[in-house]
């Protein structure tokens, strides 16, 4: 089977893993979509109803399809870099300029600065966490995230 190819149906196990309740505190507000790209754009469509500024702060280390969602939605973009341990190097001086922050973990670990996320949230910045690489991490999702997006196929 090729990457990104067809996934045949398989019956679910009788024992539930409670993934949704662990990652989404409000499990009644969940949409199942075709891909991570669709998920991010779906969230952006909701955010754009109130976000007139449309300035995003995204990880410099991200795939083109994720960035494309923001371009398609008409967002201006700032990028944050990472150190050698994949810890984001956020610039606090950008908080007043941005309206949206995308956080994510890599290789199963969320290394972002939760205090920076809290400062953004307090300043009215919408927070989205992409949990594609940390979906099954026992740490769970960031409690300050307004939106959580995941591609379970990856």
Task: Describe the predicted segments one by one.
Residues 39-41, 63-67, 110-111, 135-138:
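Short, well-ordered alpha-helical microsegments
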Residues 23, 32, 48-49, 70, ...:
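Generic structural signal for beta-strand residues in well-ordered domains
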Residues 44-93:
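Conserved PLP-anchoring active-site segment centered on the Schiff-base-forming lysine
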Residues 1-52, 73:
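Conserved PLP-binding active-site segment in aminotransferase class I/II-type PLP enzymes
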Residues 16, 36, 40, 63, ...:
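Amphipathic coiled-coil/heptad-repeat helices and related helical stalk/stem segments
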Residues 83-154:
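Active-site phosphate-binding strand-loop segment of PLP-dependent enzymes
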Residues 30, 77, 127:
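Hydrophobic anchor at the start of a short beta-strand
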């Amino acid at each position: 089977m090729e990457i990104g190819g067809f996934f045949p149906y398989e019956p679910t196990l009788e024992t539930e893993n409670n993934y949704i309740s662990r990652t989404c505190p409000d499990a009644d507000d969940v949409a199942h979509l075709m891909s991570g790209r669709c998920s991010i754009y779906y969230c952006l469509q909701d955010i754009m109803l109130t976000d007139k500024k449309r300035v995003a702060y995204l990880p410099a280390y991200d795939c083109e399809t994720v960035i494309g969602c923001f371009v398609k939605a008409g967002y201006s973009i700032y990028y944050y870099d990472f150190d050698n341990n994949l810890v984001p190097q956020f610039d606090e001086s950008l908080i007043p300029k941005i309206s949206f922050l995308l956080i994510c973990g890599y290789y199963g670990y969320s290394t972002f600065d939760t205090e920076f996320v809290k400062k953004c949230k307090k300043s009215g910045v919408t927070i989205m966490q992409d949990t594609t690489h940390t979906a099954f991490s026992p740490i769970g999702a960031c409690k300050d995230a307004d939106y959580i997006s995941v591609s379970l196929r990856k």
